[in-house]
C-alpha cells in the first residue's frame, strides 16, 4: 500500500486537511502518517528516515504533503525518496501580486493561539459542558444557540464541536419520554424560542443507536423511537423551529448546517 | 478591507483551512465569510451575488477560496467579480499521473461520515464526558490516555478535542489542593502509569485564569498557583510522566504534541 505523510513544523493539521482532500478524490487506499513539529535538523532527518523506509517498504515512492514555505528543514524533506506536494507554493506568488504585499512566512500561525479567539473557545466549552443535556435551565440568556432533540440525535457532540471549533456557546436540551404525552416548548425555553434549533434522526438509526446502549428496553424499542421522532418533528413544524435530520451527517456537517441556517457568527477564524 | 470567501458544496472546512493557511502568510486583515453547501444553481447564484457585492463594497476584488473540482456550479462561481483560488486543481493531474488512477471527484467526502471513524468519535466523546475531571475513577482500563494536571491547565478542552477530532478516549484527572501536601500518583491511577500524560502551565498565566473565575480566593492566589505548579512538575519528573507546558499553546497544538509524544494512533483519517 502506498504511504502518505502529512508533515509540518507546526501541528500538521493543515497538511492533513490538504492531503486528505486530495487523496479522497482517488478510489484507492493509503497508509497514513502524520509527523508534527519538525522544528530541528534532528527531527527533519528522523522524518526523512521514516519516509525513506516507507518508500523502500512499499516499493513505490511515498507521498509527502507539507506546507514548509521558507525553512532550512525544507531542503532535508525535499531530499527524501518521495513525491512532494506543497500546497502553499503555487498560490503564494499570485497572492503576493494580487495583494501587493510580500508574504511573511511564520511557522505555527494557522493553528496556534490567537488570544481573543482562544478565550472565546475555552469559555464556550465550559458553557457547553454546564448546559449539556438540560442539566441547567437557568442560563439560556448566554446561549448563542440551544439545540433540542430526542436522546441520541447528536446534540452533545454538536454542542461541543460548535464550542471547540467556533467559540459558539451552544446549550442543549433533550425531549424525553416524560415530555411526549403533550409535547410542547418548556416554559423556561419559551423566552428563547429564536435560539432553538432542532435535530431529528431517522427512527431506524435511532433504534440501532439506542439498542447499542440499552438493548431490549422501552427506550430502544421501535415503537418508542418512532413515536418520539414523530412527536418532535411535529413540534418543530408547528412551532417553526428550524431543524435538520442528522442521520447521514457527520458532526462537521451538522454544525456547518447549523451555522448556515442560523447565520451565527463564528468567533474563530 | 479585502473580503475573503471560503466556499464549497460541502462543509467548506477544507476551503477554510486552505484559505486561512495562505492568508496567514500576509501581514494584513481580511473580512472572512464562509458559504457552505452550495449544492444548487440557486445557491450558487446567491453566493455569486454576495461575492460581487463584497467586491463593489471593498473596491477591490474579493478573494474566493474553493475546492470545486468538476461541478456545474463551478462555472457560476468562476464568473464572479473576484480572484479565485482552487487548491485542488494544481495537484490533481500530477497525482493522477503518479498513482496511475483517474480522480473521481465526489462531493462531501472529506468531512462526511465514514461509518467506522464516526462511531469511534461519538464513543470517545461519551468516554471523555463521563471520565472528565476525575468524576469516575473506575474506568481507566478503557482510556487511550489519561491527562493529569492542576485545575485550569487545559485538561478538559484537550480531552474533548482528542475525542472529537481523533476518536481517542482521553480521561482526565485533576490534582487539587487536597493532594498537594504529599503529592503522589493516586492508587487508582497507578496501574495505568503508562497512560498518564501531564499538563503544566506558567504560574502567572494560571493566576490570571483562576482570577477570572474566582478573584481574591486562595484558589487564585499567587502563592497557591506557584505551589501547585511546582508540586506537579516535581511529580512528573520524579515519576517520569511525560508532560508539556500549555501556556502558549492552542488546543490544536496541545493535542498534536500529545499525539507526537505518546505515539497514539488517531482513529480518524
Swiss-Prot record, chains A, B:
Catalytic activity, reaction form: [pyruvate, water dikinase] + ADP = [pyruvate, water dikinase]-phosphate + AMP + H(+); [pyruvate, water dikinase]-phosphate + phosphate + H(+) = [pyruvate, water dikinase] + diphosphate
Which top EC class is given?
transferase
Sorted keywords for this record are:
Kinase, Nucleotide-binding, Serine/threonine-protein kinase, Transferase
This molecule's function is given as: Bifunctional serine/threonine kinase and phosphorylase involved in the regulation of the phosphoenolpyruvate synthase (PEPS) by catalyzing its phosphorylation/dephosphorylation.
Q: What is this protein called?
A: Putative phosphoenolpyruvate synthase regulatory protein
Q: Which residues take part in binding ADP?
A: 149-156
Question: Which superkingdom?
Answer: Bacteria
Q: Which family does it belong to?
A: Belongs to the pyruvate, phosphate/water dikinase regulatory protein family. PSRP subfamily.
Which source organism? Colwellia psychrerythraea (strain 34H / ATCC BAA-681) (Vibrio psychroerythus)
Q: A single Pfam family, by name?
A: Kinase-PPPase
Q: Which InterPro entries match?
A: Kinase-pyrophosphorylase, PSRP
Citing just one GO molecular function, the answer is:
protein serine/threonine kinase activity
What's the source species' lineage?
Bacteria, Pseudomonadati, Pseudomonadota, Gammaproteobacteria, Alteromonadales
EC number in record: 2.7.11.33, 2.7.4.28
Amino acid at each position: 500500500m502506498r504511504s502518505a505523510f502529512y508533515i509540518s513544523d507546526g501541528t500538521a493539521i493543515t497538511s492533513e486537511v490538504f492531503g486528505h482532500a486530495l487523496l479522497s478524490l482517488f478510489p484507492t487506499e493509503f497508509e497514513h502518517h502524520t509527523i508534527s513539529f519538525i522544528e530541528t535538523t534532528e527531527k527533519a532527518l528522523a522524518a526523512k528516515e521514516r519516509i525513506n523506509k516507507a518508500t523502500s517498504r512499499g516499493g513505490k515512492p511515498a507521498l509527502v504533503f507539507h506546507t514548509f514555505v521558507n525553512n532550512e528543514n525544507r531542503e532535508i524533506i525535499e531530499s527524501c525518496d518521495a513525491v512532494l506536494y506543497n500546497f502553499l507554493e503555487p498560490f503564494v506568488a499570485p497572492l503576493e501580486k494580487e495583494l501587493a504585499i510580500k508574504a511573511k512566512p511564520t511557522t505555527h500561525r494557522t493553528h496556534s493561539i490567537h488570544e481573543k479567539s482562544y478565550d472565546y473557545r475555552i469559555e464556550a466549552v465550559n458553557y457547553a459542558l454546564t448546559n449539556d443535556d438540560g442539566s441547567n435551565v437557568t442560563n439560556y440568556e448566554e446561549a448563542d444557540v440551544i439545540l433540542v432533540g430526542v436522546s441520541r440525535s447528536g446534540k452533545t457532540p454538536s454542542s461541543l464541536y460548535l464550542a471547540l471549533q467556533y467559540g459558539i456557546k451552544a446549550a442543549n436540551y433533550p425531549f424525553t419520554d416524560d415530555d411526549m404525552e403533550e409535547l410542547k416548548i418548556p416554559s423556561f425555553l419559551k423566552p428563547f424560542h429564536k435560539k432553538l434549533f432542532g435535530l431529528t434522526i431517522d427512527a431506524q438509526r435511532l433504534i440501532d443507536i439506542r439498542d447499542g446502549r440499552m438493548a431490549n428496553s422501552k427506550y430502544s424499542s421501535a415503537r418508542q423511537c418512532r413515536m418520539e421522532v414523530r412527536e418532535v418533528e411535529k413540534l418543530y413544524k408547528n412551532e417553526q423551529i428550524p431543524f435538520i435530520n442528522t442521520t447521514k451527517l457527520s458532526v462537521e456537517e451538522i454544525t456547518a448546517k447549523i451555522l448556515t441556517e442560523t447565520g451565527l457568527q463564528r468567533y474563530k477564524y
